[in-house]
């Protein structure tokens, strides 16, 4: 038995260090299908379903795996998913949960990362474009035999951008998906706060808050076709400003114990990654440079830094660590709001 255990260990290590390191790749399906190294965060699925909040907002710093986790949730819940993507991952051991929920829901997925503009009108157009792309992803509704003629006409208008009621667009798409599938909808909204940050920078914050409040109010509050929703962002914007009246609304931040290990890398995960690539002797450097965060009860490393450092070590075992995160996206948003509050 010991011989087989050792053999299995070396086989796993060999397979791991032949995997590519996913620098900048935030698509779960791409990582799993194209042979990239993946640190398993699928326990988040189990935690969400066992906690079952109607609307959950996760706030974490930039470059901590929020978008990848949202992509993972989409791949798990969406009808028609490739279930083999989850083979060998934590969640696959919970067979009952997988049987009940994997590939069982229509999903609306929006990333608001690209919503920006020097004035409100251009930012609103960008938001409309992002919503239009998601509507187009569900093009099959145009010829659905389940929908009525009136429903299909409405969808065609939405598809061609002829329905200018942007605030009701997500709820309306939810309704059509529900009627088509006979199943309530999962809504995933990534980087929800980016439009507000860009608006704050460019002087149209009040207008954008009003628009987002209306959009979220229809999609998350008065939406009878909603199964549950998950949002991510860097900041917790005041509930009174855009989440007014939402029932069963949960905010999970860096001080909360729940989900504290699901965004960012734990100490054990970093050690295993370096061991898998035969660079375990550089663990002290990784810990000194990148173990600077404490979420809930967990010490957490910035994934962006760790992955970039590991990639450098693969080609150059003596590579020096550096602050990769500073050269990527930063958290300027936080500083701007703090500076404004101090004035």
What is each model feature region?
Residues 2-343:
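Phosphate-binding site recognition
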């Amino acid at each position: 038995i010991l011989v087989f255990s050792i053999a299995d260990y070396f086989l796993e290590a060999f397979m791991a260090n032949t995997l590519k390191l996913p620098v900048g790749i935030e698509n779960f399906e791409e990582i799993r299908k194209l042979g990239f190294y993946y640190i398993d965060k699928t326990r988040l699925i189990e935690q969400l379903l066992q906690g079952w909040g109607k609307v959950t907002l996760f706030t974490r710093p930039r470059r901590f795996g929020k978008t990848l986790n949202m992509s993972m949730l989409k791949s798990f819940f969406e009808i028609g998913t490739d279930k083999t993507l989850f083979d060998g991952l934590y969640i696959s051991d919970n067979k009952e949960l997988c049987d009940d929920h994997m590939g069982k829901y229509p999903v609306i997925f929006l990333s608001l990362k690209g919503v920006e503009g020097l004035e409100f009108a251009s930012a609103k157009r960008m938001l409309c474009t992002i919503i239009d792309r998601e509507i187009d992803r569900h093009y099959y509704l145009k010829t659905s035999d389940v929908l009525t003629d009136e429903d299909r006409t409405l969808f065609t208008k939405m598809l061609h951008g002829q329905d200018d009621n942007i605030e009701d667009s997500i709820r309306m798409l939810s309704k059509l998906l529900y009627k088509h599938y006979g199943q309530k909808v999962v809504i995933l909204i990534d980087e929800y706060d980016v439009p507000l940050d860009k608006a704050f920078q460019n002087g149209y914050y009040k207008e954008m808050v009003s628009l987002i409040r209306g959009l979220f109010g229809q999609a998350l509050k008065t939406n009878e076709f909603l199964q549950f929703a998950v949002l991510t962002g860097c900041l917790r914007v005041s509930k009174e400003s855009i989440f007014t009246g939402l029932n069963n609304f949960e905010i999970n931040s860096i001080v909360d114990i729940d989900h504290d290990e699901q965004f960012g890398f734990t100490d054990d995960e970093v050690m295993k990654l370096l061991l898998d690539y035969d660079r375990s002797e550089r663990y002290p450097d990784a810990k000194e440079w990148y173990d600077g965060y404490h979420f809930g009860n967990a010490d957490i490393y910035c994934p962006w830094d760790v992955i970039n450092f590991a990639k450098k070590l693969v080609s150059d075992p003596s590579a020096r660590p550096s602050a990769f995160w500073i050269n990527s996206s930063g958290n300027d948003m936080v500083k701007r709001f703090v500076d404004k509050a101090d004035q």
